[in-house]
């Protein structure tokens, strides 16, 4: 009776263990499906984040290269402008000065010759012809008028242009200063723009790293849950195997063995034969 109750109890425990095992298997399958879905959902954002990070890194590199190119071009333009302005100033002004000095020297020589001609008016005609020839040569060289003198020379077109060139030197320098200021402002604006862009990129990268850390923590949590479920399943498998072995051992003990059955059968046949022999002996005596 105790063995029967024990067998019933073990069978009930085995059935409960099987039900729990089926439930655990269903939960494990569901967790596996959720993990697959979760990995699929996480792989797409991860790839998107990787592509975004790569694109933004490429944009930052391109912006840095473009900034370097712009700065180099601006420096080249400024240097070229400065060299052109300085070369023009040093080329134009000395030419004007040399031309003015040469014209002043020629005028002084002409005045000296005229004075000498007036002083030596009583000289020979050869000196007069020489002076006329020199005067004609000067007039052909500098395009003098017939009535030109030292006072009207300063009102000539070349002289006016010379003074205008001198007066236009300061506006050229002012324009150069304005251009340098504009270039400086442009460089400052470009640097501020790149600083703001760099700050935005850093903020975006920080946000992406935070999202990646959150996703990793979620994946680790799901993995721990899955490992716990697997360990519980292994424990239930061990309990199920133990219950099966106990049920099998109790069933073997309750069922009689064939040898004992054969021995009992042989004993009963011997007893029957002895009884028959006794009855056969008793019958002749009675007769």
UniProtKB/Swiss-Prot annotation:
Residues 255-267 have a biased composition (Low complexity). Residues 248-287 are annotated as: Disordered. InterPro entries: IF_rod_dom (IPR039008). Gene3D superfamilies: 1.20.5.170. The keyword Coiled coil applies. Residues 1-254 form the IF rod domain. Keywords: Coiled coil, Intermediate filament. GO terms for cellular component: intermediate filament. Residues 271-287 have a biased composition (Acidic residues). The keyword Coiled coil applies. Belongs to the intermediate filament family. This is Intermediate filament family orphan 2. The lineage of its organism: Eukaryota, Metazoa, Chordata, Craniata, Vertebrata.
């Amino acid at each position: 009776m105790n063995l029967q109750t024990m067998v019933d109890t073990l069978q009930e425990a085995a059935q409960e263990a099987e039900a729990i095992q089926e439930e655990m298997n269903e939960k494990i399958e569901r967790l596996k499906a959720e993990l697959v879905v979760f990995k699929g959902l996480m792989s797409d954002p991860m790839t998107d984040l990787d592509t975004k990070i790569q694109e933004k890194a490429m944009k930052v590199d391109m912006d840095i290269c473009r900034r370097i190119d712009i700065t180099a071009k601006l420096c080249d333009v400024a240097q070229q402008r400065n060299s052109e302005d300085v070369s023009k100033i040093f080329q134009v002004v000395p030419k004007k000065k040399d031309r003015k000095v040469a014209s002043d020297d020629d005028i002084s020589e002409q005045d000296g010759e005229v004075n000498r001609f007036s002083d030596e008016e009583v000289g020979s005609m050869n000196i007069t012809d020489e002076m006329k020839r020199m005067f004609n040569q000067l007039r052909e060289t500098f395009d003098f008028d017939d009535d030109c003198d030292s006072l009207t020379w300063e009102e000539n077109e070349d002289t006016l242009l010379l003074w205008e060139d001198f007066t236009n030197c300061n506006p050229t320098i002012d324009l150069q200063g304005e251009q340098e200021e504009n270039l400086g402002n442009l460089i400052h604006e470009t640097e501020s723009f790149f600083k703001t862009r760099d700050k935005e990129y850093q903020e975006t990268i920080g946000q992406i790293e935070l999202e990646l850390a959150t996703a990793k923590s979620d994946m680790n949590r799901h993995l721990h849950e899955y490992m716990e479920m697997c360990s519980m399943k292994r424990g239930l498998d061990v309990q199920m195997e133990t219950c099966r072995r106990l049920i099998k051992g109790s069933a073997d003990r309750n069922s009689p063995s064939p040898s004992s059955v054969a021995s009992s059968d042989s004993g009963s046949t011997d007893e029957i034969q002895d009884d028959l022999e006794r009855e056969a002996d008793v019958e002749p005596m009675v007769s």
